[in-house]
């Protein structure tokens, strides 16, 4: 029986791979193994590893890769060491990683250097931040590419990746949106939310803008307070500068119009997002999940500059006046939803490729494919 090893370090990447992991776990042909690390094991960010157990997953290996200082470079080195030890003991046949963070980078390095096939989900995406460098580095280490669309496929081919190693499966988390059965009343009761109307806030640090992050967050908080609306605030990820954003959020803690959470369970988050007046911040879900659920969005700052926008989203600088103006006009965007996302049966496609042996026909010896210009 082949062992399929997934690594997950955040609530975000877990939502992307959850449906794929279910397919593997429910199969009699493969053994699912999970390496849980990163933010999942931090009480400051909601100790979200418990969600994996609640969802019925087994074979979970927990590994703490951060110390109290949350230094990303040290966490990368620690993850490489811990993942290497685990892999040498487990001897997996395939390592599956997602996205652009240090945890998948560590796993891809270990896989590449140990001649183990690595499959990378959502390579070929661009955001316009340092995340792109990590994502493309992971793609160059990976042997199998599971991408969203033709745009991502072509970008990987520009990076010299073999077309035969690229499989379009769509975005795996979107299929979960159709299966969500949590009602709005249930979600509000679970998190003690008493607002009739509300918006969501998700604002993450841009590591290359560390000197201005505090000012950006202060401007955002100022605009939100002045708007006189209700907000459900979800903590940022643990990238460099997250503490500065949390410092700005201190001003919101005793304000009854703000409810702050380190993390939300994915199913409950989706229900709250679907029923929100709008979502504001710089999370990629503003351009994907919110679009699919027909929730208008306000993108603040540069974090998603490289991604395709749409007419349902307002883009503003991290300036309090611009942000407040966008909040006051966002209701006009909510009837414009002409943009559509193609939803593929991602987990089914993934499992069919896995079952057919397509992945295992690929060599761990990569060859750069030139594009004739």
From Swiss-Prot:
Catalytic activity: UDP-N-acetyl-alpha-D-glucosamine + H2O = aldehydo-N-acetyl-D-mannosamine + UDP + H(+)
UniProt pathway annotation: Capsule biogenesis; capsule polysaccharide biosynthesis
Keywords for the protein's UniProt record, in alphabetical order: Capsule biogenesis/degradation, Hydrolase
Enzyme Commission number(s): 3.2.1.183
Binding positions (UDP): 11, 15, 101, 204, 237, 283-284, 289, 303
Entry function: Hydrolyzing C2-epimerase involved in the biosynthesis of capsular polysaccharides. Catalyzes the C2 epimerization of UDP-N-acetylglucosamine (UDP-GlcNAc) and the subsequent hydrolysis of the product to form N-acetyl-D-mannosamine (ManNAc) with the release of UDP.
The name this protein goes by in its record: UDP-N-acetylglucosamine 2-epimerase
Native organism: Campylobacter jejuni subsp. jejuni serotype O:6 (strain 81116 / NCTC 11828)
Name of the gene this protein is made from: HS6.10
């Amino acid at each position: 029986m082949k062992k399929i090893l997934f690594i997950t370090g955040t609530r975000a990447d877990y939502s992307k791979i959850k449906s794929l992991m279910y397919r593997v776990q429910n199969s009699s042909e493969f053994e699912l193994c999970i390496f849980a690390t990163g933010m999942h094991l931090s009480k400051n960010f909601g100790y979200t590893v418990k969600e994996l157990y609640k969802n019925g997953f087994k074979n979970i290996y927990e590994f703490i890769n951060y110390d109290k200082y949350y230094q990303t470079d040290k966490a990368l080195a620690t993850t490489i060491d811990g993942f290497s030890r685990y892999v040498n003991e487990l001897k997996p046949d395939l390592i599956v990683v997602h996205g652009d963070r240090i945890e998948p980078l560590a796993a891809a390095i270990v896989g590449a250097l140990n001649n183990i096939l690595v499959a990378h989900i959502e390579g070929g995406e661009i955001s316009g931040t340092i995340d792109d460098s990590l994502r493309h580095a992971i793609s160059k280490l990976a042997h199998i590419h599971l991408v969203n669309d033709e745009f991502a496929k072509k970008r990987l081919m520009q990076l010299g990746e073999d077309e035969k190693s690229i499989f379009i499966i769509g975005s795996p988390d979107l299929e979960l949106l159709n299966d969500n059965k949590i009602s709005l009343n249930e979600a509000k009761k679970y998190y003690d939310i008493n607002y009739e109307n509300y918006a969501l806030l998700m604002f993450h640090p841009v590591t290359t803008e560390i000197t201005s992050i505090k000012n950006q967050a202060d401007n955002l908080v100022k605009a939100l307070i002045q708007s006189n609306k209700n907000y459900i605030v979800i903590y940022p990820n643990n990238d460099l500068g997250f503490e500065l954003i949390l410092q700005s959020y201190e001003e919101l803690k005793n304000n009854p119009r703000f409810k702050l959470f380190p993390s939300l369970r994915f199913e409950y988050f989706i229900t709250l997002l679907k029923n929100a007046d709008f979502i504001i911040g710089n999370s990629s879900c503003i351009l994907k999940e919110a679009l699919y659920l027909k929730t208008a969005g306000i993108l603040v700052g540069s974090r998603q500059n490289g991604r395709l926008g749409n007419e349902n989203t307002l883009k503003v600088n991290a300036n309090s006046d611009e942000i407040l103006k966008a909040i006051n006009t966002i209701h006009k965007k909510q009837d414009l939803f002409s943009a559509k996302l193609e939803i593929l049966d991602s987990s089914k496609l993934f499992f069919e490729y896995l079952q057919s042996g397509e992945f295992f026909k690929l060599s761990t010896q990569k060859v750069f494919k030139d594009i004739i210009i």
